[in-house]
């Protein structure tokens, strides 16, 4: 064997095994959810949960970083979203929390840090509330830009609305649901800074359209009228709340969530840090650093 061939063969034998995997989890009501795992099999576990209408693919900048840094990374598409099955039932937060529980159990995820964006945080809060017997599976929570109450009570004072950064009025929720097809592009664009490229915006918009407008409307109505304020004080694991100065969700009310969680911490991405609702996409280097610093502290 020639020396070059011998060296090539030796290097090939030393190449780390590809541990990336894509599979399906079947929920208790028979829906198949698409998931991916990457990174070392024995690495610290981290699970990324997308927001309303979003997909696992939108976490790709986090998957690339954390899997390369030695973490075992799991992402999944919620029912009706992304590459998962798209039934005509189950579009409510309680069902999505049950789906999350099925995923955790079937993949046997333990000592896992959950990073949840937007509605993914609501799903995590619902899961914490509904499945107390499974709480020891989770080591850390990172809640990204989600209000504890999305829709303001019409009888609230302005101060009460600001305290929780309620984004909608009741009529506003139903208007969004009714006009879903036309409302989606401007609504998605409002979640980014002006610096997002048109190619990136169109790609994210295409991800949003992987769930039907009908099912997205049903889901947002259920999501928008949930109130998680009584759940927050019962979270007893390390939790970080991330807000954005440029987000559609006013940062003070998002950071307020951390004050309701015992020992909760908060970090607000500034304008200079591209602190939009999608700061993890627009400033992945800073976002990944903040998350990793928290879960390893």
What are these regions (language model features)?
Residues 236-275, 281:
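Conserved loop-alpha-helix segment in the C-terminal half of the alpha/beta-hydrolase fold
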Residues 120, 124-128:
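Short helix immediately C-terminal to the catalytic nucleophile in hydrolase catalytic domains
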Residues 125, 133-175:
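Flexible "cap/lid" loop of the alpha/beta hydrolase fold
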């Amino acid at each position: 064997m020639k020396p070059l061939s011998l060296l090539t063969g030796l290097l090939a034998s030393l190449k780390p095994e590809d541990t990336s995997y894509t599979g399906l989890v079947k929920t208790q009501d028979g829906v198949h959810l698409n998931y991916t795992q990457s990174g070392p099999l024995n690495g610290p576990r981290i699970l990324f949960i997308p927001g309303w209408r979003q997909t696992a693919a939108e976490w790709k900048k986090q998957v690339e970083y954390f899997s390369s840094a030695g973490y075992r990374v799991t992402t999944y598409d919620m029912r009706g979203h992304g590459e998962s099955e798209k039934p005509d039932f189950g579009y409510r937060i309680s069902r999505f929390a049950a789906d999350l529980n099925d995923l955790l159990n079937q993949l046997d995820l333990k000592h896992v840090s959950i990073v949840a964006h937007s509605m993914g945080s609501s799903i995590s809060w619902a899961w914490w509330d509904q499945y107390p017997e499974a709480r020891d599976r989770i080591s850390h929570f990172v809640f990204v830009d989600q209000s504890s109450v999305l829709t303001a009570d019409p009888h609230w004072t302005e101060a009460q609305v600001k305290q929780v950064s309620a984004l909608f009025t009741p009529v506003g929720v139903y208007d969004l649901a009714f006009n879903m097809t036309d409302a989606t592009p401007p609504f998605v664009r409002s979640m980014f800074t002006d610096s997002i490229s048109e190619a990136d915006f169109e790609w994210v918009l295409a991800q949003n359209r992987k769930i039907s407008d009908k099912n997205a409307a049903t889901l947002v109505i259920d999501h928008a009228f949930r109130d998680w304020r009584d759940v927050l004080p019962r979270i007893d694991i390390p939790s970080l709340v991330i807000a954005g100065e440029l987000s559609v969700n006013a940062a003070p009310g998002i950071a307020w969530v951390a004050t309701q969680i015992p020992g909760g911490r908060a970090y607000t991405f500034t304008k200079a840090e591209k602190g939009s609702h999608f700061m993890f996409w627009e400033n992945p280097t800073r976002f990944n650093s903040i998350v990793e610093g928290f879960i390893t502290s």
